[in-house]
Amino acid sequence: MKHGIKKRKLSRCTEHRLSTLKNLSISLINHEQIVTTLPKAKELRPYVEKFITIAKNKNTLHGRRLLLSRLHNSKLAVDKLLNVLASRYQDRKGGYSRIIKFSTRKGDCASMAVIELVDRDIAARGKVYSKNKEGGKVVTQS
């Protein structure tokens, strides 16, 4: 019985699911906006918000080491968390990200969503980056 278990399995084993969430959170921290499936976005949101809270409250060596251990030793993402995002969200108590339903994916009709950080860079606002079949990035206005 699944009493008290509210997490989505995302059709993956535990290690693969955690690795997927870590990789998605690194991408979201670096780019501040990503396009993914709706269940992944809903599962990713509390995961990333905990990282931002750690960066805000524990801007010490211990906090840096906590974030490095939980983000696959991605120094670029940890530096951005501690230097840029922690100062940006210093006055905000929560709700650092938003999920916007996007469209359905053409191949399997999966519901897609845009997850982005609130109060992100003004220059990047309104642009959604998605990959085309050739691997290049296409900018579309949302």
From Swiss-Prot:
Keyword Ribonucleoprotein among UniProt keywords: yes
Record protein name field: Large ribosomal subunit protein bL17
Disulfide bond positions: none
Entry keywords, A to Z: Ribonucleoprotein, Ribosomal protein
Organism lineage string: Bacteria, Pseudomonadati, Pseudomonadota, Alphaproteobacteria, Rickettsiales
Species annotation: Wolbachia sp. subsp. Drosophila simulans (strain wRi)
Subunit and partners: Part of the 50S ribosomal subunit. Contacts protein L32.
Cellular component terms (Gene Ontology): cytosolic large ribosomal subunit
PANTHER family given in the database record: LARGE RIBOSOMAL SUBUNIT PROTEIN BL17M, RIBOSOMAL PROTEIN L17
SUPFAM superfamilies per record: Prokaryotic ribosomal protein L17
